[in-house]
Amino acid sequence: MAKGLLIVNLGSPVSPETKDVRRYLREFLSDQNVITMPKALWQPILRGFILPFRSWRSATFYKHEWTQAGSPLIAYTQVTRDRLRERLPDWDVQMAMNYGGEYPIGETLQTMAARGDAPIVVIPLFPEYTQSTTKTILDKVAASGVKTVVIDRFYDHSDYQKILAQQIDDAYEAGAYDTVILSYHGIPTAMVRHGDPYQQECETTTAGVKQYLKKVPQTKVEMCYQSKFGPVPWLKPYLRNRLMELAALGKRNVLVATPSFVADCLETLEENNVQNYQTFRANGGKNFATVRPMNGCEPFCDFLAKLAEDKIAAEANHGKA
């Protein structure tokens, strides 16, 4: 009997072809943890307007970023899994995806349980908790019927914040930047009003990272939100708008880090490296650079392995109490 570890990320289409992107978007945007509008109202909009137009456009973006290893998000999650296996040789380390058909959460957990894995630690690869990512993963974990131990967030761990700070310091040292932006995936403000802790946790992440920065003056650091979808208000400031404002203010050299993304994906590779870069340059900006996500880097894998080991130790001590 081995201890089990399951890391879970968002997911990806199985290919960058429009039909597969459409299938992926239909699954993702039908999740009521993501889109809270009543199904009777939302599904006609989704199927009649959004999927016909957004699928081919998103497929174009996926084709830009697709690699020989496939989706960057899945490829980097595989790197993370493999490096965790090196660090935890006595564990059964697996990965799952919330959407997309590959690496389904429920089937993966049931296979691990059938092999006798116990206990099984589940780590959603989202540092900050929110309904639209972590909760929907935990719903599927619960639906599997497999007994698990869940680490549902890790934004406030000092070791994690130190890794982020080191990455930002290293990137900052390579260029003369006027502003360093920590950009998080946005969520609708209605979710926060209804009690979602995401905004507060993002702010705590930013404060913690600033505390550990050694080369970046804290006065140069600010935070934004990106990837807005739909007409309803989302958390502000919006990254795209802020980039235009900074360029207008003469802040022509900007470095962007994305703490809520632990692996490269469309939001980092296409939205930031292409679209936001172009927006910044078109409005008078000069130097736009990004800090790459963790992408299975050694310090992050060290952190995740220790997180899992500490969780098991804490559960064992709790059981003895």
From Swiss-Prot:
CDD domains: Ferrochelatase_C (cd00419), Ferrochelatase_N (cd03411). The keyword Lyase applies. It is found in: Cytoplasm. Pfam families: Ferrochelatase (PF00762). One of its GO terms (biological process) is heme biosynthetic process. The keyword Hydrolase does not apply. Involved in coproporphyrin-dependent heme b biosynthesis. Catalyzes the insertion of ferrous iron into coproporphyrin III to form Fe-coproporphyrin III. NCBIfam families: hemH. Belongs to the ferrochelatase family. This is Coproporphyrin III ferrochelatase. It comes from Lacticaseibacillus paracasei (strain ATCC 334 / BCRC 17002 / CCUG 31169 / CIP 107868 / KCTC 3260 / NRRL B-441) (Lactobacillus paracasei).
